[in-house]
Amino acid sequence: MKIRASVRKICDKCRLIRRRGRIIVICSNPRHKQRQG
């Protein structure tokens, strides 16, 4: 899980989700997991 100021999709399978007011990227590739800090 990377915490970043700006999250973006890295590949086609990345999905942007809003959870508890935070933007999260989930993907089948675990390296692409991100959260907005």
Swiss-Prot record:
Keywords: Chloroplast, Plastid, Ribonucleoprotein, Ribosomal protein. InterPro entries: Ribosomal_bL36, Ribosomal_bL36_sp. GO terms for molecular function: structural constituent of ribosome. GO terms for cellular component: chloroplast; ribonucleoprotein complex; ribosome. Belongs to the bacterial ribosomal protein bL36 family. It holds the Pfam family Ribosomal_L36. This is Large ribosomal subunit protein bL36c. Its main location: plastid. The gene is rpl36. It is found in: Plastid, Chloroplast. GO terms for biological process: translation. It comes from the Eukaryota.
